[in-house]
Amino acid sequence: MEHMNFKPGWKILLILLSGIFLSLDIQAQRIKVHGNVKDSYGEPVVGANVIVKGTTSGTVTDIDGNYQIEAPKDSSLIFSFVGYISQSIPIKNRTEISVILEEDVITLGEVVAIGYGTVKKSDATGAVTQVKPDEINKGMATSAQDLLVGQTPGVVVTLTGGKPEAGGEIRIRGGSSLNATNDPLIVIDGVPVDNSGVTGMSNPLSMIPPDNIESFTILKDASATAIYGSRASNGVIIITTKKGMSGKPQINFNANMSVSTSRRTTGVLNADEFRRLIAEQTGTSSQAYQLLGNANTNWQDEVLRTTVSSDYNLSVGGQYKILPYRVSATFTNQNGILKTSSMNRTTASISLTPKFFNNTLSVNMNVKGLYIRNEFPDEAAIGGAVSFDPTQPVKVPGQEIGNGYFMWLQQNTGAVIGIAPLNPVSLLDDRSMISHVYRSLGNIQLDYIMPFLPELRANLNLGYDVSKSRQWNKMFPNSPITYKENKKLGIGQTETLKQLKRNQLLDFYLNYSNDFRQIYSKVEVMAGYSWQKFYKDGSTITTLMPDNEPWYDKTYADHLQLLSFFGRINYTFKDTYLLTFTLRGDATSRFSKDHRWGTFPALALGWKIINEPFMQPVANVMNELKLRLGYGITGQQDISDNYFPYMPLYSMGFPTASYPFGDRYYNTLRPNGYDPNIKWEETTTWNIGLDFAFLDNRISGSFDYYYRETNDLISRIPVPAGSNLTNEIYTNIGSLRNEGVEFSISSKPIVTNKFIWDLGFNIAYNSNKITKLNKSNDADYYIPVGGISGGTGNTVQAHKVGYPAFSYLLYEQVYDKDGNPIEGLYVDRNGDGVIDEADKRLYKSRDPKVVMSFTSRMEYKNFDFGFSLRANLGNYVYDNVQSNNSSYSAIYNSAGYLNNLISRGTKFQNPQYMSDYYLHNAGFLRCDNIVITKYKGLDPEVFSGIDNNVYPRPVTFLLGVIITY
């Protein structure tokens, strides 16, 4: 196996850091300047920025519009505030400067972050969107992705349930792959992070408190993302955190208290209804009737609760001599509505942004740390609470087995029925799953302007991301779950999971930028090198209580390296015609040396129509009109945890496959499938867009059309027996297409110093279709996906050419004249008189066709009021809760136990899992805690498209306070 190795010069880094701190006392001759900032009405402008020109040193005005700042006596001050025209005023050795800001609303000179640099928003040629959390509605956002929900067209964020610290699935313009990851690349302060998280922490964005985020920049099309090459097929989200400014220290304290409760519960039969049903279906002298208890237990009430949570954020920003700094700490205590679930998180961060040598060397240093303690519940209790017999008690007085919790026992022997469902309360109380996670992420970025050529800059970025976790999963002795099948009867177990993940980064690039006024041209050329290494190791050890006798032991270690060369040219002619060309070459250790390298080009053109002479008659009304056209290719190689899919390797077998020898069981190894010719998955994107703004920029927006096609899809396919080490391998086969349009518009109807009203609307349409799936182009070939509970190996979704990914594959239900489904009767689609697999139809998809959002935010002095409406249209959900808990045959199992049914049953005698009766339109209109939908399940927003007792999202009521000093 060929390795790519590189060791960064950490000694050089230490020398640079020493130089920074030794230079803190070196200052230019400085004076203290004070003054006042007012608007054209004579009212003080509160919170206006006052910055020393050419530096990051600055302060903000107080409640009376006053400021005080220290600056070189021959420098200039820049005064700015949202909605007003910025002013640059030379100090000229003055100690008092007061200004009046004129109203402007928005400036098109706003700078947005792109890959390895920044660009003025008006000069961007790609599909780039910026979201600033401080300018959107406030709320109980405990994670960064909460702030992106509904904020920009084409970006869909679906939370994976309501548990504390729940992650979210983020999709930009649909998915570009079937088996490789569809997650966008996330870059935090210049460091691309691993989206897979770590053992004991499902959300990789947990360490970035929402209050610390300055902006999100979302790169959508290939002309914008290709600079990141191999990791950008699914778009890029650049997160920039807040930095310090000069002046006296500014202290911010945010406190939020919230109360959460379940929105509603699944409707099931109560104890009396269940007794009547058993009597009707089996008779009062039946074995089933004899199993009924005397209790009246609402199992969902027993496992759910109302909770109180809190979140506190404290930050201090300012400047010490020539060192701007910002320090923050966050403490979050979030309790889940499912009992025994909680999350306690502590984060800390520090940012230093000094400049040296007459501002030619800019240093940007960021260090973030996190400690999180998660207590996980056994989420099987959610489904158990729906189906468990409501006539049974939580505990049985005097019962020793199962620690007194009700269990299904054989009537004649008293032995535990191993296949019976478990008491849902015991799953929470008699289990313990606790994790401790430590994580640190940081970087130092040095940007140096060459003294011999000021137009040339060198940029070095050294970064790291290290996580360490430990999780203990315990089944207490004599607990009901220890009597379950494949467990040691009554013997407790402790499963200990450890994991270390390490991500190292080195980026270096040169950037040349110059205005050639004599030929009306501006040129920017950038070329660079990137190296990134991912390493992980860990272990899983299972021991038996009380003597910690080993039962299962697995250790592993893996690494992945990426090596890249990249370049970009930006050319502007007459500030009207724009061109961007990007080229990146990537190598990955995930593929063999013959397929290791991939080349990813991109080209974008822009035309500022507003700057044409023929637009001058409307220039006083229209402020921006820009046409964009982009083309590019991006790559994909991220196949989850499969680091070497081209090599024949062995992995540790499962505990159930251990081999007995003497009085012990030994782990076995199993072979992994491999393809020596696996290579890059490539996505080609075309994009055309139009940006506009008018009425002094009070109304602005954009329109985009895109076409994306992914070829050489990395797919997991079956292979003939004997042709490989397993019956399935990852290989390149197939194509996938996404096509859509996006539109957004925002308005500021009212902007004054005291009152601001923002309105925003966006809508996106996406069409997804598989265009190739196998080499033979077999029209009948499909890949079954979407496993469900119930039966053995049942699936309800499929990938097939000509249909969207994750389409539903079900029988078409036949109904009687009253609209009731007829059990076992389906449409004979091929007319052969037999209902079989050939009669199933591919119908609808889990993904929405249309996603919309409308926001309103009003801010008056120190108060704000806002709301957000968002809607998904065209998405469908298979209700597995209903299909698995609504047939009469399920209420009694001859092994000796009962199951409850949901109240909206079908009156089927036997389960009909493959009926499209259970497929529902799950479109919705949501305003935080209020949801309007036709879907009758708990929540229409299910990422997988299969509703199977996911952790319910709570209703949350929030009270918050913000204190600034």
What kind of region is each of these model predictions?
Residues 288, 425, 817-820, 870-934:
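Extracytoplasmic gating/loop element in the C-terminal half of outer-membrane beta-barrel translocons
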Residues 846-877:
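Glycine-rich, aromatic-lined ligand/substrate-binding cores of catalytic
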Residues 50, 79, 186, 571, ...:
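Short aromatic-centered micro-motifs
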Residues 252-294, 731, 748-846:
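Conserved small-residue
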Residues 1-356, 361-370, 378, 413-416, ...:
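Short, small/polar-rich motifs associated with maturation and membrane association
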Residues 145-149, 728-737, 777-808, 842-857, ...:
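C-terminal extracellular loops and terminal segments
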Residues 267-270, 475-477, 542, 776, ...:
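Short Gly/aromatic-enriched secondary-structure transition segments
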Residues 136, 183, 307-310, 345-346, ...:
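Extracellular/periplasmic, surface-exposed regions of secreted and cell-surface proteins
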